[in-house]
Regions:
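Short, Gly/Pro- and small/polar-rich lid/capping loops
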Residues: 58
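ATP-dependent adenylation/nucleotidyltransferase module used to activate substrates
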Residues: 2-38, 42-46, 52-55, 67-74, ...
Length: 245
């Protein structure tokens, strides 16, 4: 939900200033996320679109914590069972990990004080345990998150497509371009542009800074082989003045 929030108190409210007498900070427009305890996922509405349960405010920005990071988190916290988060709904937002709807903060300052021996032992433990990670609950939880937020996804997709279409009568297809970095954001942008305009003839420009990961370059190759993006023209603009390799 897009609503006003106090940037200091991190609480959503419908006033131009914070309702707390001790604060009175000017509120700002923000995307507010809630937590549905029944579905155990974050949602964009105060009432869960899937189950109808009342939800509670959780953060203004959030990201999923993948199974590999969950294992590392458990090792850092010295949990008795390093796989304890395999069957939990774990996210990160507001400077804290959100585990089944409850926030847990990790002090990076304290971790930076750890000895190299301790960090090395955690790395060794992670390497030996990584193959035992169970991804099944994570996949189910993400699928539930997508289902619960389908209306929101559809809304922002349609909004983005309407925005792209406002330029259809202003520019020729040959004058348009997509800045393509090989990441998730530019992939979504490419999909929205091609779908909205009904063509894959919009030029994509890939900026090769020489700092790209090998996986990024590999994805660029695979991108052109996907059924949806097959035939998309990708022009590579390489940095030839400074080589960071």
């Amino acid at each position: 939900m897009v609503e006003r929030i106090c940037p200091k108190c991190k609480i959503p409210m419908n006033t131009s200033k914070c309702v707390k007498a001790s604060c009175q900070e000017k509120t700002v427009m923000s995307t507010t996320l809630y937590w549905c305890s029944h579905c155990n996922v974050p949602i964009f509405e105060s009432v869960c679109p899937k189950c109808g349960s009342e939800s509670k405010y959780i953060a203004t920005d959030i990201r999923p914590v993948f199974p590999e990071e969950r294992l590392l988190l458990a090792l850092i916290q010295e949990k008795e069972n390093p796989y304890c988060y395999d069957s939990a709904s774990v996210w990160y937002g507001g400077g804290a990990y959100i585990i089944n709807g409850k926030k847990e903060k990790i002090s990076v300052t304290e971790i930076n004080k750890w000895s190299l021996e301790k960090i090395k032992s955690i790395k060794e433990a992670y390497d030996s345990l990584a193959e035992g990670i169970d991804q099944s609950y994570f996949e189910e939880n993400i699928a539930l998150f997508v289902e619960a937020n389908t209306d929101r996804y559809n809304y922002i997709t349609e909004e983005a497509m309407r925005f792209v279409l406002t330029y259809k009568d202003k520019f020729e297809i040959r004058d348009m371009m997509v800045s393509f970095s090989g990441g998730k954001d530019s992939t979504v942008t490419s999909h929205i542009v091609n779908t909205a305009l009904g063509t894959n003839q919009v030029l994509h420009v890939f900026g090769d800074t020489t700092l790209e990961f090998p996986t990024t370059l590999e994805y660029k190759k695979r991108f052109n082989k996907n059924e949806e993006s097959k035939g998309v023209r990708i022009l590579t603009a390489k940095n030839r003045e400074k080589n960071f390799e």
